[in-house]
Amino acid sequence: MILGLGMDVVEVARIERILAGPPARVDRFLERCFTARERAYCDAARDRATRYAARFAAKEAASKALGAPAGIRFTDVEVVRGAGAPVLELAGVAATAAARLGVRRVLVTLTHDGGVAAATVVLDGEEAR
């Protein structure tokens, strides 16, 4: 049963502008929004801004799918590499909200084209009673 659905779109140029900013501001943004694993993955790529944009979109989409729970942090949602497809790992407020909803599986898809990155998140499970 689908318990939640979220979608988000991010302009890659917006992330490029942030990454081109003062180093202290860039570091603050990256540490607030992305886990160490996400930063390592994105920073190793030539298309760094695109990878960050797609992951940012996934975090926003997950928050929407969960009903935008109060206190959720960007780092509560982590995009990790799965076997051929990205996987979302939830922690903190996101994990608590998912458990409360009865979520058993989180599906995510990422895409980018024409300067835009997008993500869709589907929460699957049995409705909590």
Curated annotation (Swiss-Prot):
Q: Which Pfam families match?
A: ACPS
- Main localization (coarse): cytoplasm
Write down the InterPro entries for this protein, in alphabetical order: 4-PPantetheinyl_Trfase_dom, 4-PPantetheinyl_Trfase_dom_sf, ACPS, Ppantetheine-prot_Trfase_dom
Any one of the GO CC terms: cytoplasm
Which cofactors go with this protein?
Answer: Mg(2+)
Could you provide one GO biological process annotation from this protein's UniProt record? fatty acid biosynthetic process
Q: Does the keyword Coiled coil apply?
A: no
Q: What class of enzyme is it?
A: transferase
Reactions catalysed, semicolon-separated, are:
apo-[ACP] + CoA = holo-[ACP] + adenosine 3',5'-bisphosphate + H(+)
The Swiss-Prot or TrEMBL record describes its family as follows:
Belongs to the P-Pant transferase superfamily. AcpS family.
In Swiss-Prot or TrEMBL terms, this protein is called Holo-[acyl-carrier-protein] synthase
- Lineage of producing organism: Bacteria, Pseudomonadati, Myxococcota, Myxococcia, Myxococcales
UniProt gene name: acpS
